[in-house]
Swiss-Prot record:
Biased composition (Low complexity): 22-46
Species this chain originates from: Arabidopsis thaliana (Mouse-ear cress)
Record flagged with keyword Mitochondrion: no
First and last residues of each zinc finger (FLZ-type): 96-140
Cellular component GO terms, alphabetical: cytoplasm; nucleus
Protein's GO biological process: cellular response to hypoxia; response to glucose; response to mannose; response to starvation; response to sucrose
Protein name in the entry: FCS-Like Zinc finger 1
Organism ancestry: Eukaryota, Viridiplantae, Streptophyta, Embryophyta, Tracheophyta
Up-regulation conditions: Down-regulated in response to mild as well as prolonged energy depletion. Up-regulated by glucose, sucrose and mannose.
Subcellular location per the Swiss-Prot or TrEMBL entry: Nucleus; Cytoplasm
Recorded GO MF terms: kinase binding; phosphatase binding; zinc ion binding
Sorted UniProt keywords: Cytoplasm, Metal-binding, Nucleus, Zinc, Zinc-finger
């Protein structure tokens, strides 16, 4: 099996008509230098009147398209994902979440207890678990405090939108000359 020598090639079957039309345009452009007025529009020669592309050639391209689709989507070491290649060699393998303690990163296992927190966070001891609980509570308090301060400031600004405390106004008569 010579997987390394093959180049990735994939054509979706849905794009068969688009492929045939673009190939016919390419063929017409390629053979555009050979203007044979004898063959143009002659149905006996298998030439389409609007382009220089034969129906027989079009069918052979359709057949070769399914050949490439079937050959490379099955035998390629890569998986076809929504019409694109996905190369599994570059996937980073994440360790299983129960392999190590979330806080101190000590390996778990060897018939030792695993202490869980919030359903999917493993710890090697009750102390590590408790420390994480305290960290999360402190973070939540800080977020709640900042949220309550912000909402209090908004309420304060909304209650007196027309009042301006920063500017000094002088009440009195102004005379202009």
């Amino acid at each position: 099996m010579e997987l390394s020598s093959r180049k990735p090639y994939f054509i979706e079957e849905e794009e068969e008509e688009n492929l045939a039309s673009s190939l016919s345009e390419m063929e017409a452009g390629f053979s555009g230098n050979n203007n044979n007025s004898n063959n143009h529009g002659n149905p006996q020669n298998g030439v389409v009147s609007s382009s220089r592309f034969s129906y027989g050639r079009l069918n052979s391209l359709r057949n070769s398209q399914s050949y490439y689709y079937n050959q490379y989507s099955v035998s390629s070491p890569r998986s076809v994902v929504s019409g694109r290649f996905h190369d599994f060699r570059f996937d980073i393998q994440q360790p299983h979440f129960l392999d190590s303690c979330f806080l101190c990163k000590k390996p778990l296992g060897d018939n030792r207890d695993i202490y869980m927190y919030r359903g999917d966070t493993p710890f090697c001891s009750e102390e590590c678990r408790q420390e994480q609980i305290e960290r999360d509570e402190a973070k939540e308090k800080k977020q709640n405090l900042s949220h309550s301060v912000k909402s209090a400031m908004r309420r304060k600004e909304q209650s007196s939108p027309t009042r301006s405390r920063d500017y000094a106004f002088h009440n009195g008569t102004v005379a202009a000359a």
